[in-house]
């Protein structure tokens, strides 16, 4: 190891180049150090790389091609002038030793003991590989003209069979002849694809931010598009639209509160409508009398009592009919006095003046006058909506 270094060598004072020759001889050591410990037996320790796949006979494990070992190398023979070397190494998985040696005749390695080769060899002719011409065949082609002619015919037939394949290979190679244009086209496609991927990532990130999603989104498919086309979404109203809708609702609402029992109130209103309609039909069919109109005939004070009034007044020996019973008894049009059945006539302005002269005006006003005047209603009248005065103003 020290011989490989060109500097930093130490020569002791007793070193004599004529006597020792080199530092290795002075130190009585070999340049390969421990690797040459068996050099006296003709064995050199080297790094050996496995040439092919094998199976170990000791542990039955597979040892791949390219695995390196510390192997003992020694010469065991010659193939003509080429030496044959044998390599002995220990399996790294067990205590078994594997021995291999070179085969110069076949340019290969042969397993001597300790392992089995994994067969992965094929015939070159079957694989359509180029076969090397043997030395004897070369000499025969040079000396024998007939053999050379036959070999030429075989080569031409092989060429005709291989022409389609060769033309296809040439076309494939011509497509890649302009490498600059092809490189530019490939880089342009890569840029377009990268831009599309970036746009898709931006859309996905926007959707994830909008929906607050943390899961990764997968690319959409045709089935997803069909399923999305079947869905229908309604547009959500904004805050202003909702407020406008509420205002419209409030404006169109009724001012009067609805009764709690709307169904019962509707039934009651229906019954009232029916009663009013029946009343109208009854009034239309029956004749209207003076008593029905509520007309009362007012007489003067000096007019003698009418015979009807005298008849109504009970005598001293007769029992008096209570007023409530008389009011409860329904009266027919025949019970009314004859003077009430007359058609009312409007009094003249003169009659109005006479009636006003009968009653002096009080300073209190019309309210006091209405309180002093007794309410005399005819028993046949239904109300006091209309009053007619038939008193003789001229007699007064």
UniProtKB/Swiss-Prot annotation:
Q: Name one Pfam family in it.
A: Saf4_Yju2
- What does the record note about the induction of this protein? By poly(RI), poly(RC) and Newcastle disease virus.
Feature: compositional bias, Polar residues:
340-350
Give the matching InterPro entries.
Answer: Saf4/Yju2 (IPR007590)
Where found? Nucleus
Q: What is known about what this protein does?
A: May be involved in mRNA splicing.
Q: In which residue ranges is the amino acid composition biased (Basic and acidic residues)? A: 315-327
Q: Which residue positions does Phosphoserine occur at?
A: 40, 306, 362
Gene Ontology CC annotations of this record: post-mRNA release spliceosomal complex; U2-type spliceosomal complex
Biological process, per Gene Ontology? mRNA splicing, via spliceosome; response to virus; RNA splicing
> What family is reported?
Belongs to the CWC16 family.
Alphabetical keyword list: Coiled coil, Nucleus, Phosphoprotein
Q: What is this protein called?
A: Probable splicing factor YJU2B
Looking at the record, which segments are called Disordered?
A: 1-26, 295-396
Q: Which residues form a coiled coil?
A: 182-214
Q: Which organism is it from?
A: Homo sapiens (Human)
């Amino acid at each position: 190891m020290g011989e490989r270094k060109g500097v930093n060598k130490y020569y002791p004072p007793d070193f004599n180049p004529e006597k020792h020759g080199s530092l290795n001889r002075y130190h009585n050591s070999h340049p390969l150090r421990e690797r040459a410990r068996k050099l006296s037996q003709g064995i050199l320790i080297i790094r050996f790389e496995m040439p092919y796949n094998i199976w170990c006979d000791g542990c039955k494990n597979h040892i791949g091609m390219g695995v390196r070992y510390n192997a003992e190398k020694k010469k065991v023979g010659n193939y003509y002038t080429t030496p044959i070397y044998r390599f002995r190494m220990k399996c790294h998985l067990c205590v078994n030793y594997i021995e291999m040696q070179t085969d110069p005749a076949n340019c290969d390695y042969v397993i001597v003991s300790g392992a089995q080769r994994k067969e992965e060899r094929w015939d070159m002719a079957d694989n359509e590989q180029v076969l090397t011409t043997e030395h004897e065949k070369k000499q025969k082609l040079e000396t024998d003209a007939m053999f050379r002619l036959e070999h030429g015919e075989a080569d031409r037939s092989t060429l005709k069979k291989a022409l389609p394949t060769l033309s296809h290979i040439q076309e494939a190679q011509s497509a890649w002849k302009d490498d600059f244009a092809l490189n530019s086209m490939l880089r342009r496609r890569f840029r377009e694809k990268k831009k599309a991927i970036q746009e898709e990532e931006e859309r996905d990130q926007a959707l994830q931010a909008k929906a607050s999603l943390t899961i990764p989104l997968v690319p959409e498919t045709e089935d997803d598009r069909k399923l999305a086309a079947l869905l229908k979404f309604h547009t959500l109203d904004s805050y202003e639209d909702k407020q406008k809708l509420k205002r419209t609702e409030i404006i169109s609402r009724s001012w009067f509160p609805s009764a709690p029992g709307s169904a019962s109130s509707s039934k009651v209103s229906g019954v009232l409508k029916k009663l009013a309609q029946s009343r109208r039909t009854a009034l239309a069919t029956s004749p209207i009398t003076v008593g029905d109109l509520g007309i009362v005939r007012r007489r003067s004070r000096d007019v003698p009592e009418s015979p009807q009034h005298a008849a109504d007044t009970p005598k001293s020996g007769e029992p008096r009919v209570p007023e409530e019973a008389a009011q409860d008894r329904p009266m027919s049009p025949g019970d009314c006095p004859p003077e009430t059945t007359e058609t009312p006539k409007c009094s003249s302005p003169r009659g109005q003046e006479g009636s006003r002269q009968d009653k002096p005006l009080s300073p209190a006003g019309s309210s006091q006058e209405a309180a002093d005047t007794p309410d005399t209603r005819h028993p046949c009248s239904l109300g006091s909506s209309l009053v007619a005065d038939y008193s003789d103003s001229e007699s007064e």
